[in-house]
């Protein structure tokens, strides 16, 4: 844990987990709270599933060609923008579908560049363990996104604070990836 780039990846993937679980867990109630028809929830989740395929494949392809840390920064910052547009726009079925498509494209698009960075920086010998640690952070973020989304809704009758935190976390994750050093760490030679 003495490698700052590794810590940045862990922190960034926490944000990914927060977003995924907040949306997957709470979008049905959020859509209902906004007065939209129930079919919007199904459509959003379906669009997320469908466009996730394209987003993840695109991200993986781009991660072979360009800076993985910059790809991650763009993904997280774009997530924040998409969330902001969605929550600050008047409720409409168009915006719900737009959100499902755009967030679907971004959904798990963080995985290829994150795993690619872990493998590139640290090598593949311990990639299972190292990526497992990064993924643990994702799952902790998932817990907090799902749990605190419900807490905020119960306390305040809306998801506003959960969404505001999501936007702030997007900015944080977008920035925290920038100082990652995309070069292999030196290995100690054993004799």
Where are the regions a protein language model picked out?
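Transmembrane alpha-helical cores of Major Facilitator Superfamily
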Residues: 14, 46-50, 77, 132-140
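Multi-pass alpha-helical transporter architecture, strongest
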Residues: 165-191
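C-terminal transmembrane helical hairpin of 12-TM major facilitator-type secondary transporters
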Residues: 46-52, 58, 63-117
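Loop-to-transmembrane helix entry/capping segments in MFS-fold secondary transporters
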Residues: 38-39, 124-134
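Extracytoplasmic gate region of multi-pass secondary transporters
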Residues: 2-61, 145
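A membrane-interface helix-boundary motif in multi-pass transporters
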Residues: 151-169
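Paired intracellular helix-loop junctions of major facilitator superfamily
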Residues: 118-127, 157
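Interfacial helix-cap and linker-helix signal at transmembrane-aqueous boundaries
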Residues: 31-32, 62-63, 148-157
């Amino acid at each position: 844990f003495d490698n700052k780039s590794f810590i940045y990846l862990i922190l960034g993937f926490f944000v990914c987990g927060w977003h995924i679980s907040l949306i997957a867990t709470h979008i049905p109630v959020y859509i209902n709270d906004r007065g939209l028809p129930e079919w919007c929830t199904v459509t959003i989740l379906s669009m997320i599933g469908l466009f996730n395929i394209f987003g993840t494949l695109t991200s993986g392809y781009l991660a072979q060609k360009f800076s993985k840390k910059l790809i991650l920064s763009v993904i997280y910052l774009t997530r924040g923008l998409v969330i902001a547009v969605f929550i600050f726009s008047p409720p409409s079925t168009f915006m719900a579908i737009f959100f499902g498509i755009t967030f679907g494209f971004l959904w798990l698009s963080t995985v290829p560049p994150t795993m690619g960075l872990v493998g590139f920086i640290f090598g593949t010998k311990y990639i299972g363990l190292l990526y497992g640690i990064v993924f643990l952070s994702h799952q902790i973020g998932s817990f907090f996104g799902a749990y605190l989304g419900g807490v905020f809704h119960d306390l305040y009758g809306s998801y506003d604070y959960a969404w505001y935190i999501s936007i702030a976390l997007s900015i944080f994750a977008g920035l925290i990836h920038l100082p990652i050093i995309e070069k292999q760490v030196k290995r100690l030679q054993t004799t």
